[in-house]
From Swiss-Prot:
This is GTPase Obg. One of its GO terms (biological process) is ribosome biogenesis. Its EC number is 3.6.5.-. The gene is obg. GO terms for cellular component: cytoplasm. It is an enzyme of class 3 (hydrolase). Residues 161-326 form the OBG-type G domain. Mg(2+) binds at S174, T194. Monomer. Keywords: Cytoplasm, GTP-binding, Hydrolase, Magnesium, Metal-binding, Nucleotide-binding. Residues 2-160 form the Obg domain. The keyword Transport does not apply. GO terms for molecular function: GTP binding; GTPase activity; magnesium ion binding.
């Protein structure tokens, strides 16, 4: 299983152009044939292309060096060298490409099949046939190929999912994503079952919605406690937030307050995202009463109740996801 990655550095290089050829025609009855050195092939380009089934940057290692192929040298009989193969780097939708040294954003690839040439390969050198003139009938020189270019890039995913499930440890996030998608997010009765985001796809009438089961948040996450900053960074890259609150516990309002406060401290802008409050574990004793209290207290929020085991509210919740995502 690949580790989840939504940011990494790559060092990419385009290919060198091939050298031009110094050659002279040598055929029977043509002892002093003219120059016939062909041009070098161009170096390969570096191309970034969006691939629809990618969700993370896990195909690559942080700091990995990737290079396009060099062009081949020219040959006699005016034959050009072969062009170098392009380097195609596949990335998920919503990938931003930065110059890692200047921190400037160079490109943003949002949609399936978007592509961009980040570096052009070096031009091939001209063969000596190009330098023949009335005063230079036998040029014994050719151009070298142009060198390729190198860039230190940083890739970042600006959006990792349509919906991010947020909650305290053991709120039931992993069970929910397993219920509504084909994901099999690890489910167990201990904190921090989810340590990296897990993804699932909800499909309704040929429309897909990406759901992320994000690591559980605890009080102090905005100060780096627990999975802290990594968790909160992932939250910022989802379109819709779902606060999952265990209403079988009488501390349900405390759970809500912790979630709101940690987001506010880390980045108050996160509170402007679309969100749904989901009361989980309605099948347990006392949960329905707590759910009704939660709806009353949070009367201005979208509040839904679910039971994964009794299949209560699941279809309504999925419909709400699609409504908010406007898919």
């Amino acid at each position: 299983m690949h580790l989840f990655k939504d940011s990494l550095n790559l060092i990419v290089s385009s290919g060198n152009g091939g050298a031009g050829c110094v050659s002279f025609l040598r055929e029977k009855f043509k002892a002093k044939g003219g120059p016939d050195g062909g041009d070098g092939g161009r170096g390969g380009d570096v191309i970034f292309k969006v691939k629809s089934n990618l969700k993370t940057l896990s195909l690559y290692r942080n700091g990995q060096k990737l290079s396009a192929s060099n062009g081949k040298s020219g040959m006699g009989l005016k034959k050009s060298g072969a062009a170098g193969s392009d380097l195609i780097i596949f990335v998920p939708p919503n990938t931003s490409i930065y110059d890692a040294d200047s921190n400037c954003m160079l490109f943003e690839l949002k949609n399936f099949n978007d592509e961009v040439v980040v570096l052009k390969g070096g031009r091939g050198g001209l063969g000596n046939v190009n330098f023949k003139s009335s005063t230079k009938r036998t040029p014994r020189f050719a151009q070298p190929g142009e060198s390729g270019l190198t860039l230190n890039l940083r890739l970042e995913l600006s959006l990792i999912a349509d919906v991010g499930l947020v909650g305290l440890p053991n709120a039931g996030k992993s069970s929910l994503i397993s219920k509504i998608t084909a994901s099999r997010s690890k489910v167990a009765n201990y904190p921090f079952t989810t340590k990296i985001p897990h993804f699932g796809v909800v499909r309704v009438s040929y429309n897909d919605l990406i759901i992320a089961d994000l690591p559980g948040i605890i009080e102090g996450a905005s100060k780096g406690i627990g999975l802290g900053f990594e968790f909160l960074r992932h939250i910022s890259k989802t379109q819709i937030l779902v606060f999952l609150i265990d209403v079988s516990s009488n501390d349900f309002m405390s759970a809500y307050d912790i979630l709101i406060n940690e987001l506010r401290v880390y980045d108050i802008g996160l509170l402007k995202k679309k969100r749904i409050i989901v009361a989980s574990k309605l099948d347990l004793e006392g949960a329905t009463e707590n759910f009704n209290q939660l709806k009353s207290i949070l009367s201005e929020e979208r509040v839904l109740g679910i039971s994964i085991y009794d299949n209560i509210g699941i279809n309504e919740l999925v419909s709400e996801f699609f409504s908010l995502a406007k898919i």
